[in-house]
Amino acid sequence: MSFVPTKVFFTKGVGRHKEYLSSFELALRDAKIEKCNLVTVSSIFPPKCERISVEEGLKHLKPGQITFAVMARNSTNENNRLISASVGVALPADETQYGYLSEHHPYGETAEHSGEYAEDLAATMLATTLGIEFDPNKDWDEREGIYKMSGKIVNSFNITESAEGETGLWTTVISCAVLLP
């Protein structure tokens, strides 16, 4: 059986509960993908895959459906502990080529920092496969300019969720790229 996704949507969520597993379930509900049997996969954005809205993507899902996703997930039960989960995306200018999705799930990073890091990871992975010359020691903003000026990388972005832990509760954050037939 060969399955190459033709559509993708991005979603994120936060859940809080006294039980760890229940906090994850609530994060899935917040992201609107709780009815699926999620199978996490690695980080390739398929060629010619169309990005659709969450609302459109949900129309393709049925309860119990085996659903493939790239997921970043993080949890804490520590009060005031900052957590985040981010999926970075880098797309090539040539739609017949594949792009990259990256997962990042740190502690103590803001959503902005976590998102930029995940986006940088995806763009760097794509740049290395496309033969774009760059200095890995330069900061993300400078490398982003180099990547996009090369004409080989057309777009990069991220979807990120962050939250702080609360006393007596588990807090879970997720960010997902949901891949559809």
Swiss-Prot record:
Entry cofactors: pyruvate
UniProt-listed InterPro entries: Pyr-dep_his/arg-deCO2ase, Pyr-dep_his/arg-deCO2ase_sand, Pyruvoyl-dep_arg_deCO2ase
Presence of the UniProt keyword Nucleus in the record: no
EC number assigned by the record: 4.1.1.19
Reactions accelerated catalytically: L-arginine + H(+) = agmatine + CO2
GO MF, any single term: arginine decarboxylase activity
Site (Cleavage (non-hydrolytic)): 42-43
Coiled coil: none
Cofactor note: Binds 1 pyruvoyl group covalently per subunit.
Alphabetical UniProt keywords: Decarboxylase, Lyase, Pyruvate
Biological process (GO), any one: arginine catabolic process
Name of the top EC class for this enzyme: lyase
Domain of life the protein comes from: Bacteria
Positions carrying Pyruvic acid (Ser): 43
Family in the record: Belongs to the PdaD family.
Protein name in the entry: Probable pyruvoyl-dependent arginine decarboxylase
Species per Swiss-Prot/TrEMBL record: Chlorobaculum parvum (strain DSM 263 / NCIMB 8327) (Chlorobium vibrioforme subsp. thiosulfatophilum)
Organismal lineage: Bacteria, Pseudomonadati, Chlorobiota, Chlorobiia, Chlorobiales
